[in-house]
From Swiss-Prot:
The active site is at S80, D207, H235. GO terms for biological process: biotin biosynthetic process. Its main location: cytoplasm. Belongs to the AB hydrolase superfamily. Carboxylesterase BioH family. Substrate binds at W22, S80, L81, F143, L144, A145, I146, Q147, H235. It comes from Shewanella woodyi (strain ATCC 51908 / MS32). The lineage of its organism: Bacteria, Pseudomonadati, Pseudomonadota, Gammaproteobacteria, Alteromonadales. Residues 16-240 form the AB hydrolase-1 domain. Monomer. This is Pimeloyl-[acyl-carrier protein] methyl ester esterase. It is found in: Cytoplasm. Pathway: Cofactor biosynthesis; biotin biosynthesis. Keywords: Biotin biosynthesis, Cytoplasm, Hydrolase, Serine esterase. Gene3D superfamilies: alpha/beta hydrolase. Pfam families: Abhydrolase_1.
Length: 256
């Protein structure tokens, strides 16, 4: 089945793919455009978000649809839910994903108390699921507020996020429900050691969705895994600490 995905390709140079998180669209990366102009960057609206058509199925179906519409060899960068998509792409298509960058993204977003795994409390995700059926706009707004919580520039960050997100159509209900289900159910922890590509993991120490206890629990014995912790950032470090984020990202990209 062929579905139309909205992909904005800007710049010239090394191929990068950038994927956004839940409830938003690729316009959240607009502030990065000028700084990444020396790369060929493909800004993707995930299925059912922004200008992209929805795609039935699960995470694998999303990955298959996206990879078919992108260059054969690129470095994939994913923020939050987009990090899950990028990680799965790196695992499924190692020859097409040259490198992996995850931003404020966990391999298992939901807390697993029986395993002492830190994450989003299950009741929070179920509340979002219930609220979706009542008011999409307010649900997304609440989620955006959680993303910037903890940042010293939270007020400015939420204003910027809202302006960017609302520049495109609201996500489809089906896509929001799919995304929540992925955040609730996907657990890639056991597969992480299989990642062969260079992998940069960017964390915000004040992140309310990916707790600071997650990075120390990640596999780190591979020489090609690199962690960048931004001490004053929360869940959207590319907005709140753009210069710091870009310096870390471009330094890492320059090693290719």
């Amino acid at each position: 089945m062929s579905s139309s995905l909205h992909i904005e390709s800007i710049g010239q140079g090394q191929e990068l793919v950038i994927l956004h998180g839940w409830g938003v669209n690729s316009s959240v990366f607009t502030p990065l455009h000028a700084s990444l102009s020396e790369y060929r960057v493909h800004y993707v609206d995930l299925p059912g978000f922004g200008h992209s058509d929805p795609i039935d199925g699960d995470l694998d179906d999303w990955v298959d649809a996206i990879i078919n519409q992108l260059p054969n060899t690129a470095i994939w960068i994913g923020w939050s839910l987009g990090g899950l998509v990028a990680t799965k792409a790196a695992l499924r298509y190692p020859e097409q994903v040259r490198g992996l960058v995850t931003i404020a993204s966990s391999p298992c977003f939901m807390a697993r108390e029986d395993e002492s795994w830190p994450g989003i409390p299950p009741q929070v995700l179920s509340q979002f699921s219930t609220q979706l059926q009542q008011n999409i706009g307010k649900t997304i707004e609440r989620f955006l507020a959680i993303q910037v919580m903890g940042s010293a520039t939270a007020k400015e960050d939420i204003k910027q996020l809202k302006e960017l997100v609302l520049s495109r159509p609201l996500p489809k209900n089906s896509a929001l429900a799919q995304g929540l289900k992925m955040l609730e159910n996907i657990d890639l922890r056991a597969q992480l050691p299989q990642i062969e590509q260079p992998w940069l993991r960017v964390w915000g120490r004040l992140d309310g969705l990916v707790p600071r206890r997650v990075p120390p629990l990640m596999p780190n014995h591979q020489a090609h895994f690199t962690d960048l912790l931004l001490p004053k950032a929360s869940h959207a470090p590319f907005l709140s600490h753009r210069d710091e984020f870009l310096t870390g990202l471009t330094d890492w990209l320059n090693k290719f």
